[in-house]
Amino acid sequence: MAGREYPLERTRNIGIMAHIDAGKTTLSERILYYTGVNYKIGDTHEGTATMDWMEQEQERGITITSAATTCHWTLELEHKKAPGALEHRINLIDTPGHVDFTVEVERSLRVLDSAVGVFCAKGGVEPQSETVWRQADKYNVPRMAFVNKMDISGANFFNVVDMIKSRLGKNAVPIQLPIGKEDTFKGVIDLFEMKAYYYLDDKGEQIEIKEIPDDMKDQAEEYRAAMIESICETDDDLIEAFLEGNEPSNEELKKALRNATISVQIIPVLCGSAYRNKGVQKLLDAVIEFMPAPTDIEDIKGFDEEGNEIHRISSDEEPFAALAFKIMADPFVGKLAFFRVYSGTLNAGSYVLNATKNKKERVGRILQMHANKREDLDKVYSGDIAAAVGFKFTSTGDTICDEKHPVVLEAMEFPEPVIDVAIEPKTKAGQDKMGEALAKLAEEDPTFRVRTNEETGQTIIAGMGELHLEIIVDRLLREFKVEANVGAPQVAYKEGFTKEVDIDSKYAKQSGGRGQYGHCKVKFSPMDVNGEKVFEFVSTVVGGAIPKEYIPAVQAGIEDAMKCGVLGGYPVLGVRANCYDGSYHEVDSNEMAFKIAGSMAFKDAMHKAGPILLEPIMRVEVTVPDDYMGDVIGDISSRRGRIEGTEDNNGSKIIRGFVPLSEMFGYSTTLRSKTQGRGAYSMFFSTYEPVPKNVQEKVLSNKTK
């Protein structure tokens, strides 16, 4: 069998991320066109984008799911293949920009080595740009910025660069300048080569390289000097030479910029218009020149069976370890598990260990995905992103690895859903079908939850926003042929603890014959509801007071009971449980008895621990003309909002603040009337906070009506 097609050094794993409508998918489509994957340019406006393959994406012109594909690129120099340049493999993931699908961005960034942040040349840093940027910060992902839509009215490259510096707190360094803007945008100036690149034809394939226009020479010199200084500041050898008045060579500068990009000290900024086919090839060159290969990234950390930290190097010679970052139901091949290989190799047909669940899995087939098309592979190597068919137990965030060398890699944390709706099938016969379909959709999407309201028996689905749940209901009908009636969206309240309590819980049924006996003592205490974990269970039982095999049953009982709080039947967040003692019966004890004892312990604790109602707080950003600012701020305050700050942006005011989600229903209509249709807003989930007492009483009394 042939070995690896491309060495690791010539592999790039990149994501495309941005605010909605910044042009991510259009950029991805142009990348596929220029790298020869597509022979025709896909278009989100016409619903023909390769990467937006779901029917819902094509109808709405937005990205919903992150699509993965692979393409190849050889460095271009003066629009000729660079002498001695070798072809590189690029694994590309296009992610959604809509806040409701933030999970897709989170899991993609977890497994990618780098990302291209796309910014609209007019809108600049928008709310979701900030969200995805913070997600990339969390995983310390190297990235570069592409200022897109340089051809549209109001485009301002320099304003966007300033916004990246001020709003994202990053050292954004332009390595290109635009030639013209709006309808006069013709090309870019390369600040390394100090040449002008003009795009002559509609498809951007005929490029003319000329001297920098006279009226831009001073500006180009100024920005080149600033670029050199920024790069030199990240390299001890270069800064020394620079301060002595010696300008480094382009080769030295590019090498230092690559190191600074990989260590997230610098964000190189490029520009273009993906829709008008300008600047995309130069972006691909920059990806090859400045973005990391898997070998440039820090060793991946994990834990062995004893909980000791171990490291895996990105090498084919290491034992196999990979992270499953996405599960998808494919109508043709069944359950697909997307995974990123961090070390070692994997053959189709072999067995692996799911170290997270301690279950053996068989790799039926390995597929290379091209959006929703697939190609069979015999083997995958370190650094690869692929999908496996045949896994039964694996879910998002699980580690799969070599059975002889178990390791558990750091899992992913996902936000809690903020909106609930009640759902029921239109026919009685559809009940089971709907249950199965919802379970499959919940397996795919960790931010989508399904539960049953114990009081009414209704099925409640919860997600990150109205669009998120609308897409779920649409998929029920299209993919699973289940017609459903859906209630009005409700706020997904949660419940929490305020006090520490110590509970002694015994479940005993011993009235002749085989009995039931489970007894546990558990200390419950509140923990941060917005931390990385919303529930933590520890066992400090000693001396076999409770046999080891029954401890997980106590935990399962507590987790089950947490699905329904005592105030309004809402799920409970922010609980730490320490099972420290108990007792058992040689004959009558079993898992079920301890599960019931755990459940009873939690319900008892919930009544005694000062239960409170928690509500989702949204980060809200409103853009309005100056004249309406006072009215809009007053309205936000009347909605229990907290104003964080305001700033000027192109003649408008941006108001930022935090508002409870319950107060934001119908806000778009209010904003329209207060600003005569000239205001715009966006919001995304920030935290869960306690509901004020007077509001809590109102919410709970409305629920019982």
Curated annotation (Swiss-Prot):
GTP binds at residues 18-25, 94-98, 148-151. It is found in: Cytoplasm. It holds the Pfam family EFG_IV. Keywords: Cytoplasm, Elongation factor, GTP-binding, Nucleotide-binding, Protein biosynthesis. It comes from the Bacteria. InterPro entries: EF-G-like_DII (IPR053905), EFG_II (IPR041095), EFG_III (IPR009022), EFG_III/V (IPR035647), EFG_IV (IPR047872), EFG_V (IPR035649), EFG_V-like (IPR000640), G_TR_CS (IPR031157). Residues 9-295 form the tr-type G domain. GO terms for biological process: ribosome disassembly. GO terms for molecular function: GTP binding; GTPase activity; translation elongation factor activity. GO terms for cellular component: cytoplasm. Belongs to the TRAFAC class translation factor GTPase superfamily. Classic translation factor GTPase family. EF-G/EF-2 subfamily. Catalyzes the GTP-dependent ribosomal translocation step during translation elongation. During this step, the ribosome changes from the pre-translocational (PRE) to the post-translocational (POST) state as the newly formed A-site-bound peptidyl-tRNA and P-site-bound deacylated tRNA move to the P and E sites, respectively. Catalyzes the coordinated movement of the two tRNA molecules, the mRNA and conformational changes in the ribosome. This is Elongation factor G. The lineage of its organism: Bacteria, Bacillati, Bacillota, Clostridia, Lachnospirales. The gene is fusA.
